[in-house]
């Protein structure tokens, strides 16, 4: 994907993050390194740095079946951070740093930030460091249902400023002017991913009929190692 896009769009840049679930109530476990969003590489023009992060991702296990996809998409698009126990103090085991620290982030600007000035390329928008005037696109993949704070059938920790739900994801991606491309490895998440694509206008003409009305949700049937190779 990266190689093909670089040929078509020479100035395209890339970032990378992972997500498991909240380390709370058996959804995920801090002992396994589970978190709802982990920025691995901010948007950069250095594709080798992205490759290195993809290659070195450790195995996390989560707890129950759903995953924190909604929170991850929200943090990726919004980038304001998350304080799971609402104590205003950043806890590396459970919380998410804002991309850019400020007085109005959940830690009052004292919890650090995801942004690094040493990384080349990128910008300061969202939770990945999207560039001004670039088209932000988040490609996300999962094999599980999307834990949704707007759906009472899913439990969430009750963190600050709030646990992310479908509405937050749609609003943040829309405000960013971005797209979300979903990749599923099982049928359980299809409906939720299609709802996100529809609500954010993440559509294209993928069937060649001349109409940009196909939802950007795709099925992946290869291995995880194949996926890493395909991305880079």
Language-model segments: which ranges?
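Divalent cation-coordinating acidic motifs and surrounding scaffolds
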Residues: 1-232
């Amino acid at each position: 994907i990266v190689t093909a896009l670089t040929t078509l769009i020479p100035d395209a840049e890339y970032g990378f993050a992972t997500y498991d679930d909240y380390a709370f109530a058996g959804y995920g476990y801090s002992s396994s390194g589970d978190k709802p969003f982990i920025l691995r590489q901010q948007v950069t023009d250095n594709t080798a740095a992205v490759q290195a992060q993809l290659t070195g991702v450790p195995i996390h296990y989560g707890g129950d079946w759903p995953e924190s996809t909604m929170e991850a998409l929200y943090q990726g698009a919004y980038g304001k951070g998350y304080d799971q126990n609402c104590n205003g103090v950043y806890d590396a085991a459970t919380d998410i740093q804002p991309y850019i620290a400020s007085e109005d982030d959940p830690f009052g600007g004292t919890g650090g930030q995801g942004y690094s000035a040493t990384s080349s390329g990128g910008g300061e928008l969202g939770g990945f460091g999207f560039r001004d005037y670039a088209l932000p696109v988040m490609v996300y993949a999962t094999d599980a249902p999307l834990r949704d704070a707007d759906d009472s059938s899913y439990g969430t920790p009750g963190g600050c400023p709030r646990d992310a739900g479908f509405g937050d994801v749609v609003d943040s991606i829309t405000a960013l002017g971005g797209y979300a491309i979903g990749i599923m490895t099982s049928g359980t998440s299809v409906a939720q991913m299609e709802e996100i694509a529809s609500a954010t206008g993440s559509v294209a003409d993928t069937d060649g009929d001349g109409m940009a009305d196909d939802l950007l949700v795709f099925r992946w049937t290869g291995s995880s190692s194949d996926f890493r190779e395909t991305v880079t």
